[in-house]
Amino acid sequence: MASSDIQVKELEKRASGQAFELILSPRSKESVPEFPLSPPKKKDLSLEEIQKKLEAAEERRKSHEAEVLKQLAEKREHEKEVLQKAIEENNNFSKMAEEKLTHKMEANKENREAQMAAKLERLREKDKHVEEVRKNKESKDPADETEAD
């Protein structure tokens, strides 16, 4: 477009800015449009060409379907692997927890048995001491009675 095709008309002038209107002159009939108004005519397709296009489309559909099925199979395989790993980790955790609990129970049992053995030993020592005191008392008592008379 040439600059003669455009007219600028000032509307307002303010401190905040300027308002104006652009007036475009109508196109001259001599100028050629830059793009065609209608799409180019398509050539008539033969039966063979139509058949080839249909076969190519069918091949693309089959290829796409095969790709989708492959992706689904890979996804299922991944899900199986994840599930198997989770089950294995759960089993390992259960096994470790059971071993830990068993070890703790054995330690408690040994501790309890050691405490019981210590109590029995103290009771035996006490009984032995009581028996010694009784013997000492019996051996002293007859002597004390004769001396008192």
Curated annotation (Swiss-Prot):
Q: Which GO terms describe its cellular component?
A: cytoplasm; cytosol; membrane; microtubule; neuron projection
Q: What is one Gene Ontology biological process annotated in the Swiss-Prot or TrEMBL record? A: neuron projection development
Which residues carry the post-translational modification N6-methyllysine, per the record?
Answer: 29
Location (main, coarse): cytoplasm
GO terms assigned for molecular function: tubulin binding
According to the UniProt record, list the residues that bear N-acetylalanine. 2
Where, per the database record, does this protein carry Phosphoserine? 4, 16, 25, 31, 38, 63
Domain named SLD: which ranges? 4-145
> What does the PTM comment of the record read?
Many different phosphorylated forms are observed depending on specific combinations among the sites which can be phosphorylated. MAPK is responsible for the phosphorylation of stathmin in response to NGF. Phosphorylation at Ser-16 is higher in the developing axons from hippocampal neurons and seems to be required for neuron polarization.
Q: List the residue ranges forming a coiled coil, or say none.
A: 41-140
Q: Which SUPFAM superfamilies match?
A: Stathmin (SSF101494)
Which portions of the sequence form the region Disordered? 104-149
Give residues where N6-acetyllysine occurs: 9, 100, 119
- Biased composition (Basic and acidic residues) is annotated at 104-143
Q: InterPro entries in the record, alphabetically?
A: Stathmin_CS, Stathmin_fam, Stathmin_sf
Q: Which UniProt keywords apply?
A: Acetylation, Coiled coil, Cytoplasm, Cytoskeleton, Developmental protein, Differentiation, Methylation, Microtubule, Neurogenesis, Phosphoprotein
Name where it's found: Cytoplasm, Cytoskeleton
Oligomer status and interactors: Binds to two alpha/beta-tubulin heterodimers. Interacts with KIST.
The text of the family note is:
Belongs to the stathmin family.
Described function: Involved in the regulation of the microtubule (MT) filament system by destabilizing microtubules. Prevents assembly and promotes disassembly of microtubules. Its phosphorylation at Ser-16 may be required for axon formation during neurogenesis. Involved in the control of the learned and innate fear.
> Any idea what this protein is called?
Stathmin
